């Protein structure tokens, strides 16, 4: 195994935890992330097995910047799996869009990028006017997933040589998905691991929207260059940090 250094955000439970656990078991150098010290205790077992821990609440932009700074002091990451996500409430836009955008802009020399999308993105609206990026009010989960899927495609276009893909893990039985979710949890995290570390040609492709190992056609706005550019301009203005 070629050992890769991989950050998995939001890895205290659910899909992030499963991905971090699997990558660690495969011998990779994994950086796990929790939003606070209390949640970080759930990662003790992975840390004991050699995972490195970063802690920071992704609703706080300064915490995201601090984590990026800490990681930039170490050797570049071979991959980042942008897994952290919330499905309702005021944290939706800060956690699902602003945090992955800032990490993408700030982390230097990352080899591959994997962004967690959702089938919900098909119901998202490609409208940027009036979006509350700071989380003063509840955000639309569907819109947030459309935006992050478009971000993945924009990064693929602007950073040739850096595979950047979005993954729909399906409706899986995590805390977010609920116990009755019909999709396979194992398949839910396997695609993001494969995109992060595999040297198969398909895994090294870029600009894809993936579901259970297959490339699918995303919402039409995802590959609309004008929308991508508007999104990047909006996020750069909002954060003061350009991609």
What positions do the PLM features span?
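Short alpha-helix in the Rossmann-fold core of NAD(P)-dependent oxidoreductases
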Residues: 57, 85, 92-107, 114, ...
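A glycine-rich helix->loop->beta "capping" turn
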Residues: 48-50, 70-82, 86-91
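C-terminal helical subdomain
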Residues: 166, 182-233, 237, 241
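Conserved glycine-rich cofactor-binding loop
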Residues: 12-13
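Rossmann-fold cofactor-recognition segment
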Residues: 47-62
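Conserved glycine-rich Rossmann-like NAD(P)H-binding loop of the short-chain dehydrogenase/reductase
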Residues: 26-42
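Rossmann-fold scaffold of SDR-type NAD(P)-dependent oxidoreductases
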Residues: 9, 77-85, 96, 115-118, ...
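Catalytic loop of short-chain dehydrogenase/reductase
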Residues: 85-90, 112-160, 168-181
């Amino acid at each position: 195994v070629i050992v890769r250094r991989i950050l998995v955000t939001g890895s205290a439970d659910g899909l992030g935890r499963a991905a971090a656990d699997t990558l660690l078991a495969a011998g990779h150098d994994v950086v796990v992330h929790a939003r606070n010290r209390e949640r970080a205790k759930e990662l003790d077992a992975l840390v004991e097995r050699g995972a490195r821990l970063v802690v920071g609440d992704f609703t706080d932009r300064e915490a995201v910047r601090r984590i990026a700074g800490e990681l930039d002091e170490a050797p570049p990451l071979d991959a980042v799996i942008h897994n952290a996500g919330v499905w309702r409430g005021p944290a939706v836009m800060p956690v699902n869009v602003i945090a992955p955008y800032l990490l993408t802009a700030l982390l230097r020399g990352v080899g591959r990028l994997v962004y967690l999308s959702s089938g919900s993105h098909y119901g998202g609206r490609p409208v940027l006017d009036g979006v509350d990026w700071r989380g003063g009010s509840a955000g639309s989960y569907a819109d947030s997933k459309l935006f992050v899927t478009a971000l993945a495609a924009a990064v693929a276009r602007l950073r040739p040589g850096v595979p950047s893909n979005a993954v729909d893990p399906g409706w899986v039985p995590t805390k977010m998905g609920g116990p009755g979710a019909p999709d396979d949890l194992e398949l839910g995290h396997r695609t993001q691991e494969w995109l992060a570390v595999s040297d198969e040609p398909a895994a090294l492709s870029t600009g894809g929207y993936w579901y259970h190992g297959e490339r699918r056609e995303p919402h039409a706005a995802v590959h609309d260059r004008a929308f991508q550019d508007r999104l990047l301009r909006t996020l750069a203005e909002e954060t003061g940090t350009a991609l």
